[in-house]
């Protein structure tokens, strides 16, 4: 097996991990699954030799986990500076800056936005990644980000319609425990 096909295999694994990410209405589960996906796709990009994308994806994974604990603007600024610095230091072609831009805007969204607004900004970020992945020849990366674009776009429309009907799509229903079901 060549390094190229190993990289593509890791990309397909990332595809399988990430395919259901945007169906999560629970933001904690959404962020955890997004973090795992980001780490695996980061390995994929390093194996392909697209280092700005690999570094951006690994920073995405770490950043997404950290947003579960804090929404500090200082922490956000650190991730934005790291992403921009690493991306600018390693890029060789202008298209390699798209994942850096996508990571910066999604960092802002994860720290400063919630619900539908966060998902809309994430959709824009996904557009940046789709263009990059196609350019880089990433089969799994293009498949997953293209799927993210479609699924997140459809879910944005679905959640927006729910809000128009007065339903909070991000309110997670709690199942009653066995103790509560006596009766």
UniProtKB/Swiss-Prot annotation:
The keyword Transmembrane applies. Coiled coil: none annotated. It holds the Pfam family Imp-YgjV. Residues 1-2, 60-71, 114-133 are periplasmic. GO terms for cellular component: plasma membrane. Keywords: Cell inner membrane, Cell membrane, Membrane, Transmembrane, Transmembrane helix. Residues 24-38, 155-183 are cytoplasmic. This is Inner membrane protein YgjV. The gene is ygjV.
């Amino acid at each position: 097996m060549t390094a190229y096909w190993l990289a593509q295999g890791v990309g397909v694994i990332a595809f399988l991990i990430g395919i259901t990410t945007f169906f999560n209405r629970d933001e904690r589960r959404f962020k955890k699954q997004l973090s795992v996906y980001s780490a695996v796709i980061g390995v994929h990009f390093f194996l392909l030799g697209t280092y700005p994308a690999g570094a951006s994806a690994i920073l995405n994974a770490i950043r997404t986990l950290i947003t579960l604990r804090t929404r500090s603007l200082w922490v956000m600024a650190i991730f934005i500076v790291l992403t921009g610095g690493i991306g600018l230091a390693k890029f060789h072609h202008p298209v390699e800056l798209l994942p850096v831009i996508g990571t910066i805007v999604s960092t802002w969204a994860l720290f400063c936005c919630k619900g539908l607004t966060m998902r809309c900004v994430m959709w824009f970020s996904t557009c940046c990644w789709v263009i990059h992945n196609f350019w880089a020849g990433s089969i799994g990366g293009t498949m997953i980000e293209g799927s993210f674009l479609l699924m997140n776009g459809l879910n944005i429309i679905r959640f927006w319609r729910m809000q128009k009907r007065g339903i909070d799509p991000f309110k997670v229903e709690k199942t009653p425990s066995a103790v509560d079901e006596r009766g």
